[in-house]
């Protein structure tokens, strides 16, 4: 299940809000200018599908969002655990690429998670919002929003990414160390799983 946890940015130990209800997540994120939707998944998409197959399977979603939002570049990002030599190094590099707080300057952050999971953290005002995002979640964050993404130590996700910038993913680091002070992927995922088991 998806999960939203909100903390004061000065206290990562005391959540001010926690919900796994998609409607509540959508409402809470909508209140801070973000978008959250649950979308239908394609059951016939192979687990190891390449980017072209992923885009083809979700062509209707891609076309809808491109038409509505004017995106000019769409790609697929992700990683799947393998026993291939060097995979652990790649996993560390992928996690490190996204885990420091950053913005995307003059572009939005729009991601449709089609497989696996990850945690998006939004630092807006005096609050940090962690969204445990799983397959079927569409998350949209306005340009200039400070955020980070934790793939976990064993990244296992596939996401379709949408851009207004034809250069695709370009980050601007804030220089803050805040991401290291908040519960990481493993902690947030464990909380989501504990709630799911209730």
Where are these regions (language model features)?
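N-terminal leader/capping segments at the start of a protein or of a new domain
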Residues: 1-71
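A short glycine-rich, His/Asp/Glu-containing loop-to-beta-strand
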Residues: 38, 62-108
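Conserved metal-binding segment of the jelly-roll/cupin
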Residues: 133-153
């Amino acid at each position: 299940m998806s999960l939203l946890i909100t903390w004061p940015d000065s206290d990562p130990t005391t959540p001010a809000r926690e919900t796994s209800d998609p409607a509540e997540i959508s409402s809470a994120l909508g209140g801070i200018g973000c978008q959250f939707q649950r979308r239908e998944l394609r059951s016939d998409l192979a687990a190891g599908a390449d980017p072209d197959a992923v885009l083809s399977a979700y062509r209707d979603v891609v076309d809808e969002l491109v038409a509505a939002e004017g995106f000019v570049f769409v790609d697929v990002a992700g990683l799947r655990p393998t026993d291939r030599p060097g995979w652990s190094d790649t996993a560390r590099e992928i996690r490190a690429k996204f885990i420091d707080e950053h913005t995307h300057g003059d572009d939005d952050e729009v991601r449709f998670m089609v497989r696996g999971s990850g945690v998006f953290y939004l630092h807006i005002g005096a609050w940090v919002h962690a969204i445990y995002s799983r397959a079927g979640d569409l998350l949209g964050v306005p340009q200039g929003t400070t955020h980070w993404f934790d793939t976990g130590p064993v990244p296992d996700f596939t996401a379709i990414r949408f851009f207004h910038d034809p250069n695709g993913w370009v980050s601007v680091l804030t220089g803050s160390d805040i991401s290291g002070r908040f519960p990481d992927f493993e902690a947030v995922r464990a909380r989501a799983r504990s709630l799911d088991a209730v």
